[in-house]
From Swiss-Prot:
Entry similarity comment: Belongs to the PsaJ family.
InterPro entries, alphabetized: PSI_PsaJ, PSI_PsaJ_sf
Membrane-crossing segments per the record: 7-27
Name recorded for this polypeptide: Photosystem I reaction center subunit IX
Location in or out of the cell: Plastid, Chloroplast thylakoid membrane
Pfam families, A to Z: PSI_PsaJ (PF01701)
SUPFAM superfamilies assigned to the protein according to its UniProt record, in alphabetical order: Subunit IX of photosystem I reaction centre, PsaJ (SSF81544)
The UniProt record lists the keyword Membrane: yes
Taxonomic superkingdom: Eukaryota
Gene Ontology biological-process annotations: photosynthesis
Gene this protein is translated from: psaJ
Membrane topology according to the record: Single-pass membrane protein
The entry's keywords: Chloroplast, Membrane, Photosynthesis, Photosystem I, Plastid, Thylakoid, Transmembrane, Transmembrane helix
Protein purpose: May help in the organization of the PsaE and PsaF subunits.
Length: 44
């Protein structure tokens, strides 16, 4: 039961950090390439 409580307390923290980092990455991409439908480094 203690392991379950540890898991339930760690999962929200890790998901918050993950989604925060993902949001920051998306914000920086949109800052560098505003309104980009196709990114220059993805065009072949």
């Amino acid at each position: 039961m203690r392991d379950l409580k540890t898991y339930l307390s760690v999962a929200p923290v890790l998901s918050t950090l993950w989604f925060g980092a993902l949001a920051g990455l998306l914000i920086e991409i949109n800052r560098l390439f505003p309104d980009a439908l196709t990114f220059p480094f993805f065009s072949f």
